[in-house]
Structures are given as structure tokens and as C-alpha cells.
Amino acid sequence: MKLIILDRDGVINQDRDDFVKSVDEWIPVEGSMDAVAFLTQAGYTVAVATNQSGIGRKYFTVQNLTEMHAKMHRLVRQAGGEINGIWFCPHTDADNCNCRKPKPGMIEDIIGRFNAQASETWLVGDSLRDLQAIDAVGGKPALVLTGKGKKTLSQHGHELPEHTQVFDTLLDFSQYIMQENTAPQAD
């Protein structure tokens, strides 16, 4: 099982300081739909792991989130890709749950659900907490510089997990993965 986990806000869609609260505010990052299509076509299972504390803060509802995710699914399919599952944490930091990144609960659940190997699983995110969550299970962290990624790199570059790879966009990450898949293997 080849699994890639994507953070949502700032990676797949544009992020907002005041939360993405509705389907109209959910706007894809340029190239992200094609990136998911490339990953799908390369044989990867693609899952989304997203903290959505706006639900816990009552900024939007689960129904609003469902509508945003329906739009994301539709646009990804139109590009020729597939998202095989979406996991979200509705809690705030004060709830002290195990699913809110950087805690690894959501990531462990995804890896278990797809019977994947943590050490072979990528997580692409734009925040330190995304990278810490995949690092906690022994996976492969990738930072993209969209969303909060540039700020994360400048303010937390010294704290990134040791094997973090940095890409400008999700599309750049997907092209790297496709090159890795087509590179000749050593005997």
C-alpha cells in the first residue's frame, strides 16, 4: 500500500486567518487538483487529515465541512484524481484529544485503516504540527511553502523533523513522487 496523507488548509486549498468556513471560501491552491490526480495515477492512495477546530469554536458546522469536502472531491475527480478518505478533528487545543495534530491519533487511524506501513507513508503539510504528527509515527514529512508553509520554515525551520523535505507546492511534491516512481531501481 502506497499511502500519502495530505493536510487540507494551505496544502490543497487556500487557507484563511479567519478559518475556511463555507463552500464559497474553499478555493483550491493552484495546481493542487492536478497534484492529487498525479498521485492517484502513480498508484498512491490519498487521504486527507485536517484539524478543523472551527467546528469546536462554532465558526461553522459539520454540514458546512461536508459541503466543502464534496466540492473538493468533485474538483479532484474532474482532474482525474481520487481522495480515498478524509479524517478531521473538530476539537480545539483545550479539548486535549488524541486526534488533533501534532498528536498522532488521526494519522495512526489512517495508516491502520489502509493497512499501510508508517515508515513508507508521506504526510504533506504546511505547519509544524502536521510534520510532527507524521514524525511521531515514523513516517515521511514533507513541508509545502503554500498556506502557512513559508512562515513555518522561517519561524520553525530549526524544529522541523530531521528528514523533512521541502517543496514549493503540492504539485512540486507530486512531480517529485512521480520521478521517484519512474527512476531506475538499483539491483
Swiss-Prot record:
Annotated site, Stabilizes the phosphoryl group, chain positions: 50, 101
Keyword Magnesium found: yes
Keywords: Carbohydrate metabolism, Cytoplasm, Hydrolase, Magnesium, Metal-binding, Zinc
Catalytic activity line of the entry: D-glycero-beta-D-manno-heptose 1,7-bisphosphate + H2O = D-glycero-beta-D-manno-heptose 1-phosphate + phosphate
Major localization class: cytoplasm
Site positions (Contributes to substrate recognition): 100
Cofactor dependency: Mg(2+); Zn(2+)
InterPro entries to which the protein is assigned, alphabetical: HAD-like_sf, HAD-SF_hydro_IIIA, HAD_sf, Heptose_bisP_phosphatase, Histidinol-phos
Binding-site residues for Zn(2+), renumbered to this chain: 89, 91, 97, 99
Enzyme nomenclature, EC number: 3.1.3.82
Molecular function via GO: D-glycero-beta-D-manno-heptose 1,7-bisphosphate 7-phosphatase activity; magnesium ion binding; zinc ion binding
Record's subunit section: Monomer.
Protein name according to UniProt: D-glycero-beta-D-manno-heptose-1,7-bisphosphate 7-phosphatase
Protein's organism: Neisseria meningitidis serogroup B (strain ATCC BAA-335 / MC58)
